[in-house]
Regions:
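C-terminal non-catalytic regions of proteins with extracellular/luminal or membrane-system context
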Residues: 1-290
Length: 290
């Protein structure tokens, strides 16, 4: 295959398939060009998070948080210290990864250090077969005593999957029940019940949920636990996406994304579920109108 293109006047030239705005030679960046490219990429990743996040619920304008409210935040969920950045599909990465806590620090949030310390003592495994959430026993009386000083509750919930890493329909929970992994597990329910209790008794002024997942979870529980606001943040990426999450919480930017999937109260309510799973019969009746 020729690397040259013949022009109308008969002369030939080497075609330019992509002209980078950072370098004339994308295979040989200078140090300054590489720095400029990386800075632009980080800004793009942050803006992608800001423009893709979806506000699923916002009762009584619970979001955005005021300047006073971001100084008194209690962060719940093991995902707070072990965020979900991207799915298992594909590759890519970044020379630096900004965590959720680092992003909050950069925007002058003050949060409950007792909660963070309790989560960091745990070593939980999270993958497409497991749900990594702390047991309610970590919220000791000494931890609960700190809630009144940090009266804005932000709960982060995550699921992790990707290509060839499908989430299971038969998750074996610690209470011996079996359910889809898109539903809450016992530890998550216990945590949400605890936050709901302190929201009802007036200790917490707001109850915010962040869905840090690329998978479509069941969300009927948002009403069950009295959640004030819920923000879908997806996977913010392996770089600066969590800066965007922090800015969404403060209202410096507005969530402008739209859902491409239906967030149902039960994933089993879809008509397609009647034909889902391992089919052992030789004949199958198709039911989608073929």
């Amino acid at each position: 295959t020729s690397k040259y293109v013949k022009k109308a006047d008969g002369e030939v030239e080497i075609p330019t398939y992509f002209q980078s705005e950072f370098s004339k030679d994308i295979n040989n960046f200078t140090v300054d060009e590489l720095k400029a490219k990386n800075e632009a990429a980080e800004k793009f990743i942050e803006s992608e998070e800001e423009e893709s996040a979806v506000l699923l619920k916002n009762d009584n304008n619970a979001l955005p948080l005021s300047k006073d409210e971001i100084k008194k935040v209690s962060l719940f969920g093991y995902t707070t210290v072990m965020p979900y950045y991207r799915s298992h599909s594909g590759g890519g990465g970044s020379q630096r990864t900004v965590s959720f806590l680092e992003a909050l620090d950069s925007r002058d949030f003050s949060y409950n250090k007792a909660l963070i310390a309790a989560y960091k003592e745990l070593k939980l495994e999270r993958n497409f077969k497991t749900i990594a959430e702390a047991p309610v026993s970590i919220y000791t009386n000494s931890v609960k005593d700190t809630f009144s000083a940090y009266n804005t509750a932000i709960v982060t919930i995550s699921r992790e999957a990707g290509e060839n890493d499908d989430l299971t329909l038969n998750y074996a929970d610690s209470d011996r029940t079996t359910h889809t992994i898109l539903a809450l597990n016992k530890n998550e329910k216990d945590m949400l019940s605890l936050v709901s209790e302190y929201r009802k008794n007036g200790t917490f002024n707001k109850f915010i949920v962040l869905l840090n997942t690329s998978n479509t979870m069941e969300v009927g529980w948002l009403d069950d636990y009295g959640v004030d606001a819920c923000l879908y943040i997806g996977g913010p990426g392996m770089s600066t996406g969590f800066y965007g999450v922090a800015d969404l919480l403060t209202g410096d930017v507005s969530p402008s994304g739209k859902l491409v999937d239906t967030y149902s109260t039960s994933s089993l309510s879809s008509p397609a579920m009647r034909n889902f799973g391992t089919i052992s019969t030789k004949n199958l009746i198709y039911a989608e109108g073929i």
